Amino acid sequence: MTDKKALAEMLSRNRLFDELTKKDVRALVNSAMEVEHREGRTIVVEGNPGVGFHLIIDGTAIVSRNGRKLRTLGPGETFGDIAVIDGGPRSASVKAETRLRTLSLPQWEFKPLLLKHPQLAYKMLVKLCALLREAEKRPPV
């Protein structure tokens, strides 16, 4: 198990959370749990409802859409960022390429955290808007 200070540091380096205060990041880490996924396990299925957010601690994962590989994720990267907020369907599938450890934050833990820390919700909203604008500028795949 990874110590919470190291997890908080890893989370704060992620572009979605890099502007949060140390207190906000600690609150996220304290509400999350570490999960181990075996190699080859499908963690997220495209089209299924989103129930949580994952920060990769160790290992690699493959992101695919319509059976086509989009990218590989590694330590410090996340998936499920938007689904944890809106619970909407997953836009892609994610499969453990190697043994994978993630810090997982389910939606039911995340929502009360946002209500308790409204500044966290605002900071994430601003960051998600920036990510959306960036995505809109990319050519279609």
In which residue ranges do the predicted regions lie?
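Cytosolic regulatory regions built on CNB/CRP/Popeye-like sensor folds
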Residues: 1-141
